[in-house]
Amino acid sequence: TIAYGLRNLTDFEGGLREMYRVAKPGGRMLVLDFGKPSFGPWRWFYFTYLKWMVPMFGRIFCSDAPAYAYIHESLEHYPAQDGVAKVMRDIECREVTIHRILGSAMTINVGVK
């Protein structure tokens, strides 16, 4: 299980392969992270919010806007839910599913070894 961390790895596919390697047969792999909504208006609002509002809140409440700006930046190169599901299938996970939360703003990818 990994939460809000896979997109921060330099080799997210390698991270998934390692999770698969250490999982017991029949064990579940879960990946919780930010997603990429497919519905156009929601996607626009979501990414606008992440790019502008989240860093502003980070500056106001935590005095650290760059730490929160990083969320949007890290999503630009992250394949999100569909890319994670594809890699899970490629490494032979079974029963791969995507649970979409808040219109795919957050997602949980699940696979079984």
Predicted region positions:
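C-terminal alpha-helical "lid/dimerization" subdomain adjacent to the S-adenosyl-L-methionine
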Residues: 32-91, 97
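Short glycine-/acidic-enriched loop or helix-start segments at secondary-structure transitions
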Residues: 12, 40-41, 108
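A short glycine-rich, Lys/Arg-flanked "PGG" loop and its adjoining helix->strand segment in the class I
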Residues: 13-28
